[in-house]
UniProtKB/Swiss-Prot annotation:
This is Glucosamine 6-phosphate N-acetyltransferase. It comes from Mus musculus (Mouse). It catalyses: D-glucosamine 6-phosphate + acetyl-CoA = N-acetyl-D-glucosamine 6-phosphate + CoA + H(+). Pathway: Nucleotide-sugar biosynthesis; UDP-N-acetyl-alpha-D-glucosamine biosynthesis; N-acetyl-alpha-D-glucosamine 1-phosphate from alpha-D-glucosamine 6-phosphate (route I): step 1/2. Homodimer.
Length: 184
């Protein structure tokens, strides 16, 4: 399989979020349909492998060495599950991915078999910080989780980032986030 423009999920979902429920302030005003001059907010596609997707992710954390075959296999798994909403911002003038964030839907037995949203891997490339793209991605995915009928949405962040997430009505939970790593 060769990389192409097939989206991970239906792009219309991003256009259908109820932007009137957005709680963040954008100055200048931007939105999922108008993210800024020369920018497009859309689902990840396999062609993004060659548009700097991993370069952007690498500014967040260690990505490791990922072969095109590994990327395609993971992409197809995520796409088929229907529960992964990897969203990117592309600078179409450069043909490069400049920001990304992921919404994962977790199916539960509690709350009458409800769904929980989880935000992961929010990162904006160094060159594009200050253009509100992180805010745009988080606002969009938060509203998308509501549209997808999640009973709540959660994320983990470093203490110094709590203030940023509070702008979106996220609150610090009394629960502790615990982790056990198997890979170094």
């Amino acid at each position: 399989m060769k990389p192409d423009e097939t989206p991970m999920f239906d792009p219309s979902l991003l256009k259908e979020v109820d932007w009137s429920q957005n709680t963040a302030i954008f100055s200048p005003a931007i939105s999922p349909t108008h993210p800024g001059e020369g920018l497009v907010l859309r689902p990840l596609c396999t062609a993004d492998l060659n548009k700097g997707f991993f370069k952007v992710l690498g500014q967040l954390t260690e990505t490791g060495v990922v072969s095109p075959e590994q990327f395609m296999k993971s992409f197809e798994h995520m796409k088929k599950s229907g529960d992964y909403y990897v969203t990117v911002v592309e600078d179409v003038t450069l043909g490069q991915i400049v920001a990304t964030a992921t919404l994962i839907i977790e199916h539960k037995f509690i709350h009458s078999c409800a769904k929980r949203g989880r935000v992961e891997d929010v990162v904006v490339s160094d060159e594009c910080r200050g253009k509100q793209l992180g805010k745009l991605l988080l606002s969009t995915l938060t509203l998308l989780s509501k549209k997808l009928n999640c009973y709540k949405i959660t994320l983990e962040c470093l203490p110094q980032n709590v203030g940023f997430y509070k702008k979106f009505d996220y609150t610090v939970s009394e629960e502790n986030y615990m982790c056990r790593r198997f890979l170094k």
